[in-house]
Amino acid sequence: MKKRKSNAVNAAQVLESSVSPILEINYSDPLFTLAAHPTEPVLISGLVTGHVFCHRYDAEALEEKQSARREQLLLQEKEAFKKGKVSQISKSVSQSKNPWWTIIKDHTEVPQESGVVASWKTKRHKGSCRHAIFEPLESSVGENIFTVGTDHIIKKASSETGKVVGKVDVSLDFPNSNDSITKLCHSATNSCLLAGTENGHVLVYDSKNLGGSKLKYKVSSAHDDAVNHILAMPAVSAYHYLTLGSTTLSHIDIRKGIITQSDNQDDELLSMCFATDQINDGKNDTVLVGHGEGIVTIWKNSKNRFMDQLTRIKVNKEASIDAIIPTMNCDDDEMAASVWCGDSEGLLHRVNYKKGKVVETRVHSSSRGKYGAADEVGLLEIDYDYRLISAGMESLKIWSNEQNEEIALDESDDSDDESDSDNSEDDLSSGSLSDTASDEEIEENKEEEDEKEDKPVKIDHPLANRSKKGLVGVSKHVTKKKQIDINKLTKKGKEEEEEEQPQKKKPKKDQLSTKQLRNMQKHEHGIRRFDDL
């Protein structure tokens, strides 16, 4: 048993990326939605309580602090290794006992010298805040945010101040009074704001005139169940969108209705995106879809008009792919062909869809949380500088764009050692919308209580005036959590014999093959539901 535990740790160290977060924010109430400003270091978070918070962060300072702290800890660990105090130098990010990135223990109490500032906060919705997005129009990109809650109200607010500038009660347009909004999507070329519902309908409003506008378009029964995702297709038409719901993918024209609907996939379709190279080339032909059974499928309009999947990529057999997003990084072909996936086991996977496999794994959460197992990754965003942002209901992490050079070199050496025997073997994956109404006009006829609740509170802590050198050390978690093994991606199988490694200058333990690493891993999976939220 002791040997098996040691092998599991070795597996985690080999499979886990050395890239670490630069910032971690923990939430005292469940986090339901997240939005990253497309051009500035600004985050919007919506909670189950209906509160919306706006945080601004100094990314460069956080990167510098994280790098310096990591280097310091690495030197300390090397010294301890030389003195025999530790048996090995750990490369694992998730299993580190001394996290080197900045940690905010409570989103409501941000330390002054943390590199993060809360710009404003407000009680935006009476129920929970279900979705939040930034305005993507080129003429006003990021100037406004749209949020929707279980109170059935879509609100448009200034992203700088949080002040409401427009809103609409969508319940008046529900065919069934029991319906509710699940997802929002804004066109990148016009003022159409789409809202998907739990009963599978898509409602379209004019975002420039929310206060006085009526329903502009409606697509009834786009799906038999809740709309899980809406994706604009600007390269095809300003009125064409893809929607996911239950077990089908639909291609819709918001003016005319459903164009095509896929075959039943016998598996819930949860998330989708276009790859970076497709977006960069102005194409909307290939879409990647995350499934409830832990796979990512590839669909092409040019092949079968999105009627069925063409290829599937295995990601995590025992988890659902709850979120997927393109890297938005065109610096090299590898990143351009990759998408990030977040699963229900708290893991992050970078999938190269052209290679048809997982090429990088990170760990958002590896410990038991307040709501059950590991903090499930249900939210993914890319910040203004292509940093990955992952979030579950308990925490949010902004990941570094830089890889530790020394650790990266060590991993490269390990990879070279195993290249002869494991070059082609990898079972983790398989190849195959009138002017905006004024604030007074909108708010005057409402109850005074609503006005008080929805008034944003501005917090004066200008981040720009803070010196990078004044940042203090890294905060640490106080609560102890039970650690569980990470990267448990495949089921147990028969173990292979270990291959002998060539002698090097320094004694080195026998390297485990990829298949042996997989064989050491177990699975635990459960999908938790928050009813009526």
Curated annotation (Swiss-Prot):
Keyword annotations for this protein, in alphabetical order, are: Nucleus, Repeat, WD repeat
Compositional bias of kind Acidic residues: 408-428, 437-452
Q: State the WD repeat positions.
A: 26-67, 84-130, 176-215, 264-309, 372-409
One GO BP annotation here?
positive regulation of transcription by RNA polymerase I
List compositional bias (Basic and acidic residues) regions by residue number. 453-463, 521-533
- InterPro entries per record: WD40/YVTN_repeat-like_dom_sf (IPR015943), WD40_repeat_dom_sf (IPR036322)
Q: Name one GO cellular component term.
A: nucleolus
Q: Where in the cell is it found?
A: Nucleus, Nucleolus
Annotated region (Disordered) at 408-533
User: Family assignment?
Assistant: Belongs to the WD repeat WDR55 family.
Q: What is this protein called?
A: WD repeat-containing protein JIP5
According to its UniProt entry, this protein's organism is Scheffersomyces stipitis (strain ATCC 58785 / CBS 6054 / NBRC 10063 / NRRL Y-11545)
